[in-house]
Amino acid sequence: MNFLLTWIHWGLAALLYFHNAKVLQAAPAQGDGERQQGEVIPFLKVYERSICRPVETMVDIFQEYPDEVEYIFKPSCVALMRCGGCCNDEALECVPTEMYNVTMEVMKLKPFQSQHIHPVSFQQHSKCECRPKKDIRNKDNHCEPCSERRKHLYKQDPLTCKCSCKAPDLRCKSKQLELNERTCRCERPRR
């Protein structure tokens, strides 16, 4: 009986979702300016806003560049599209399936020395899906860490286990250096 009710519940939710998907694609998340305070927001709108999708998120620059401790960034955080929302199953999490880099100008201050506006690259998420949580995955599927030393320099694709450098090549080139893919460090070009 519970199984049947669960299927009916999800079927109804899916029907409502797909029926109104066109309308909500263009609607912003805070687009309820015309609603009166205290008015009840309908279930469908609440449900559609909670699904796993890219949403604008404020990200601390030091979270993305933990090695840049000698600088103060202005602004200290930037608005990026990142995966967020619910998966309606405790064993799943909302993760990015497509990403791209965006470059933003931020001010880098070195206290009592200098301040310059620099291009800084960040990763944005363009598509998201609900996937099994890392700690629940089968051990056969588990990815080995990128590097025991300097783990913070790498990012890892949870699907392919491929490791790549967090530091964008553009950051190194702006300093007339080259990115060493093996060490994920900016180095002087070899002649």
Curated annotation (Swiss-Prot):
Expressed by the venom gland, and probably other tissues. Disulfide bonds join C52-C94, C83-C128, C87-C130. The keyword Glycoprotein applies. Keywords: Angiogenesis, Developmental protein, Differentiation, Disulfide bond, Glycoprotein, Growth factor, Heparin-binding, Mitogen, Secreted, Signal. Residues 1-26 form the signal peptide. It is found in: Secreted. Growth factor active in angiogenesis, vasculogenesis and endothelial cell growth. Induces endothelial cell proliferation, promotes cell migration, inhibits apoptosis and induces permeabilization of blood vessels. Binds to heparan sulfate and heparin. Homodimer; disulfide-linked. Also found as heterodimer with PGF. Belongs to the PDGF/VEGF growth factor family. The keyword Signal applies. GO terms for cellular component: extracellular space; membrane. This is Vascular endothelial growth factor A. Glycans are attached at N101. GO terms for biological process: cell differentiation; induction of positive chemotaxis; positive regulation of angiogenesis; positive regulation of cell division; positive regulation of endothelial cell proliferation; positive regulation of focal adhesion assembly; positive regulation of mast cell chemotaxis; positive regulation of peptidyl-tyrosine phosphorylation. CDD domains: PDGF. GO terms for molecular function: chemoattractant activity; growth factor activity; heparin binding; vascular endothelial growth factor receptor binding.
